[in-house]
């Protein structure tokens, strides 16, 4: 599971998800990419589930890059606990995603295989996504 080795602050405020991504919004490593169309939190488990879906479809061929990392800790209080008595314990780690962020990249496979692999991965994610190709982004 993805999580930071060390953090300065264990418990973070939730924050607001506004605006679009400027950094990390273009394909940098591979030929094809999966881009977020909505804002949201993607948990470490969801990132891993989507990665497994991609690798199972691609099998031996191709290289995959994960472009997001879960830096933010989400806290939860135990069930049936009264309010107060401090903030809950860190429960999971999430990546904060803005519209336009490239989530995954891939190369070494055909366009049809990449599109299908990213379609399977998108079903594991809680946000809307779209398929990117380097040839489409270079022209525009």
Curated annotation (Swiss-Prot):
Biological-process GO terms, alphabetical: translation
Keywords assigned: Ribonucleoprotein, Ribosomal protein, RNA-binding, rRNA-binding, tRNA-binding
SUPFAM superfamilies named among the record's database cross-references: Ribosomal protein L16p/L10e
GO cellular component terms, semicolon-separated: cytosolic large ribosomal subunit
Keyword Ribonucleoprotein: yes
Database matches in Gene3D superfamilies: Ribosomal protein L10e/L16 (3.90.1170.10)
PROSITE patterns, sorted: RIBOSOMAL_L16_1, RIBOSOMAL_L16_2
Family affiliation: Belongs to the universal ribosomal protein uL16 family.
HAMAP family to which the protein is assigned, alphabetical: Ribosomal_uL16
Function as written in the Swiss-Prot or TrEMBL entry: Binds 23S rRNA and is also seen to make contacts with the A and possibly P site tRNAs.
Record protein name field: Large ribosomal subunit protein uL16
